[in-house]
């Protein structure tokens, strides 16, 4: 029996519920015994009373991608999809992720950390800047700062979601993402949005966002991006499945943005799109993720 653990209490709850329902439908259609559990508020104690052998974690954001639920399952000896608690913890914290990636000589935008309780260190890289909470996904709480006067409002927004914010040099360029399944990188997807960046609205509600797969990179460029994505994925000790996001600037230099250890699985989601490009159906994708346990 597979428990599909969805919902959660993060800002990405609504997306998790959509993802969980899609996974339930595909497993149910294949006559695989499964059920969904909507974690909401403090009802997790009810989950542990259910009978199941494995857990498909489709919780996005805090609680689901930060190692909390993974640690709970590990302590109970229960198998689950995706990365373990340590890798999840490291990947959820954007600042921690950057430190690990820098240790592996991966290319990142210059940045500093801004603590809500401390004065901000001098920013020694040029405007514009991206200001983002260290502990949220789906581009929640992110602002583009074009001048110094906008910085305070951007920090106040980011600090609503986490006590630390990342101030990062804004890299102008095209956004790409690489899905990982097992030890393989799937085809690269290019993201084109009419917004300043690929924000929450662009990801989940806009019909103007375009996704290109094939991504219009040369074969050499695509293979290079896939190789960087795999290096970034394994540097965090991630496993099973995930997604690594990039920006490629006007000089064709790729910069890592972030890693997602529990990406979305909705109709707008990019992992199913990349899988479909090489003939992997949604049914096959879901069962492949389970087989990676």
Curated annotation (Swiss-Prot):
- Could you name the Gene Ontology cellular component terms for this entry? cytosol
Keywords, alphabetical: ATP-binding, Cell shape, Cell wall biogenesis/degradation, Cytoplasm, Ligase, Magnesium, Manganese, Metal-binding, Nucleotide-binding, Peptidoglycan synthesis
Kindly list the GO molecular function terms attached to this UniProt entry: ATP binding; D-alanine-D-alanine ligase activity; metal ion binding
Per its UniProt entry, which superkingdom is the organism in?
Answer: Bacteria
Compartments where found: Cytoplasm
What's the Enzyme Commission number for this chain?
A: 6.3.2.4
Q: What is its main location?
A: cytoplasm
The entry's Mg(2+) 2-binding residues are 258, 260
Q: Which reaction does it catalyse?
A: 2 D-alanine + ATP = D-alanyl-D-alanine + ADP + phosphate + H(+)
What's the cofactor?
A: Mg(2+); Mn(2+)
Which InterPro entries has this protein been placed in?
ATP-grasp, ATP_grasp_subdomain_1, D-Ala_lig_Van_CS, D_ala_D_ala, Dala_Dala_lig_C, PreATP-grasp_dom_sf
Q: Which residues form the ATP-grasp domain?
A: 98-291
Task: List this protein's GO terms for biological process.
Answer: cell wall organization; peptidoglycan biosynthetic process; regulation of cell shape
Q: In which pathway does it act?
A: Cell wall biogenesis; peptidoglycan biosynthesis
Q: Per the annotation, how and in what number is the cofactor bound?
A: Binds 2 magnesium or manganese ions per subunit.
Q: Which PROSITE patterns match?
A: ATP_GRASP, DALA_DALA_LIGASE_2
The positions annotated for binding ATP are 124-177
- Binding-site list for Mg(2+) 1: 245, 258
Main function: Cell wall formation.
The Swiss-Prot or TrEMBL record describes its family as follows: Belongs to the D-alanine--D-alanine ligase family.
Which protein is depicted? D-alanine--D-alanine ligase
Species of origin reads Vesicomyosocius okutanii subsp. Calyptogena okutanii (strain HA)
- Which gene name belongs to this protein? ddl
């Amino acid at each position: 029996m597979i428990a599909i653990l969805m919902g959660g209490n993060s800002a990405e709850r609504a997306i998790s519920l959509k993802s969980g329902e899609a996974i339930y439908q595909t497993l149910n259609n294949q006559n695989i015994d499964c059920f969904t559990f909507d974690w909401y508020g403090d009802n997790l104690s009810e989950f542990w009373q259910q009978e199941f052998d494995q857990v498909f974690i489709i919780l996005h954001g805090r609680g689901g991608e930060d190692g909390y639920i993974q640690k709970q399952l590990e302590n109970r000896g229960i198998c689950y999809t995706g990365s373990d608690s340590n890798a999840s913890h490291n990947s959820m914290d954007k600042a921690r992720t950057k430190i690990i990636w820098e240790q592996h000589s991966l290319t990142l935008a210059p940045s500093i950390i801004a603590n809500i309780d401390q004065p901000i260190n001098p920013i020694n890289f040029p405007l514009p800047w991206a200001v983002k909470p260290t502990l949220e996904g789906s581009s929640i709480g992110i602002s583009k700062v074009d001048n110094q006067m906008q910085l305070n409002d951007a920090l106040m927004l980011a600090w609503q979601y986490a006590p630390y914010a990342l101030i990062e040099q804004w890299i102008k360029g095209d956004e790409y993402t690489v899905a990982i399944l097992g030890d393989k990188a799937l085809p690269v997807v290019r993201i084109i949005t009419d917004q300043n960046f690929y924000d929450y609205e662009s990801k989940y509600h806009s019909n103007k966002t375009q996704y290109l797969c094939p991504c219009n990179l040369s074969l050499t460029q695509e293979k290079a991006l896939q190789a960087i994505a795999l290096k970034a994925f394994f540097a965090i000790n991630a496993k099973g499945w995930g997604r690594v996001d990039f920006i490629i600037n006007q000089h064709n230099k790729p910069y890592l943005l972030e890693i997602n250890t529990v990406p979305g699985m909705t109709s707008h989601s990019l992992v199913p799109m990349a899988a479909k490009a090489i003939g992997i159906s949604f049914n096959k994708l879901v069962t492949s993720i389970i087989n990676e346990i």
